[in-house]
């Protein structure tokens, strides 16, 4: 399901849940060649998951006066019986194919991928959410893989990708876990409108 959100003052967001992740009018999904993969075990004693496979991708364009923030991230949770909750981030190069139908295409050169520059931030933000009390226990045993994304050459930043990855996990678990009220106001607005 694709949901389009108006964030006010020309800010926009799109949220995809449990479906193919491609931008309208752009046939190839936002997959990219993986040049490296960051992997970390978040919980070594995870119980069997009550979650089914879940997929979430969020794209946000947020104008801020004369500048703007842009990013898109997608992740999948795949339950298994390994007894571990594993977090993975698939890293791309910085010169992947250009996307012409992103929310920021008229403002920025947008490319598919999660380059090394943002991979650590994706890890930080998602770990922050997963380490909140009870979250990893509720998710249970399985793998969360960030393997879809786009970034802008001008509008993307490490801090934005950290908050975006946190928000992707928040959307993934929100029907089972109480939302954190200490989230960045822009992302809180996305969460409130996405229900």
Question: How would you describe each model-predicted region?
Answer:
Residues 1-195:
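Accessory interaction regions appended to the cores of large information-processing enzymes
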């Amino acid at each position: 399901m694709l949901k389009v959100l108006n964030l006010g003052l020309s800010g926009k967001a799109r949220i995809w849940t449990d479906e193919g992740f491609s931008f309208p009018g752009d046939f190839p999904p936002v997959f990219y060649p993986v040049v490296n993969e960051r992997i970390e075990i978040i919980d070594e004693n995870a119980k069997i998951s009550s979650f089914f496979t879940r997929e979430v991708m969020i794209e946000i364009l947020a104008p801020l006066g004369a500048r703007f923030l842009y990013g898109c991230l997608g992740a999948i949770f795949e339950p298994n019986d390994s007894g571990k909750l594993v977090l993975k981030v698939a890293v791309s190069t910085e010169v992947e194919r250009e996307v012409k139908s992103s929310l920021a295409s008229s403002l920025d050169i947008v490319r598919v991928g999660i380059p090394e520059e943002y991979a650590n931030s994706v890890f930080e933000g998602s770990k922050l959410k997963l380490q909140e009390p009870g979250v990893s226990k509720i998710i249970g045993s399985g793998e969360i893989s960030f393997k879809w994304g786009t970034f802008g050459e001008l509008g993307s930043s490490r801090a934005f990708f950290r908050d975006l990855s946190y928000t992707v996990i928040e959307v993934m678990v929100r029907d089972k876990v109480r939302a954190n009220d200490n989230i960045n106001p822009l992302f809180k607005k996305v969460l409130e409108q996405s229900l």
